[in-house]
Amino acid sequence: MRKIVLTAVLAALPATAMAEGLEDLVEARRGYYKLLGANMGELVAMVKGEAEYDGATAQTHAANLVTLTNYNLGHLYAPGTSKADLPGETRALPEIWDDMAGVQEKGMAFVEAVNELNEVAGLDKAELAAGVQKLGGTCKGCHDDYRAKDF
Ligand code: HEC
């Protein structure tokens, strides 16, 4: 019932105000993923030897990723925010809204890999490398199906 009321309120808003609101949501969504990417980037650099392995730093980035998995993204995936709705602004494929269960599944694999990484990131470089590789596979797993190659 609450959902229906909310829809009615949204429908009453001027179209431009709503489009702006949705654009803000998309920006926030992309910001979330940028945070994932920023932390992952530091870890990958250590694995590749572009940065020196440091257990405490690796642990910090792994813990940041755990923190990010506790964020509920649901509101950032409001209807009307796919690449089909806002071309040029987002790479989120419309398939996401047709297959929330599939997205959820990819999300769960990602959360699991983050938690595993967090267990080992501070131990040594080999453990970090294995954890990062597994996690990277779960990022790619979702991107392959639900993120467009370009905007
Ligand atoms: C459950 C699905 C899913 C998982 C898991 C996932 N992503 Fe994404 N990611 C997306 C989607 C969808 C977008 C496109 C968002 C948009 O353009 O609105 C995206 C966008 C991005 C972007 C681009 C942000 C920008 O500048 O527009 C980066 C960077 C990124 N993801 C990194 C990661 C990393 C790193 C991981 C794993 C640690 C990860 N993602 C895991 C779905 C996922």
Regions flagged by a language model, labelled:
Residues E23-F151:
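Sequence context surrounding c-type heme c attachment/ligation sites in exported
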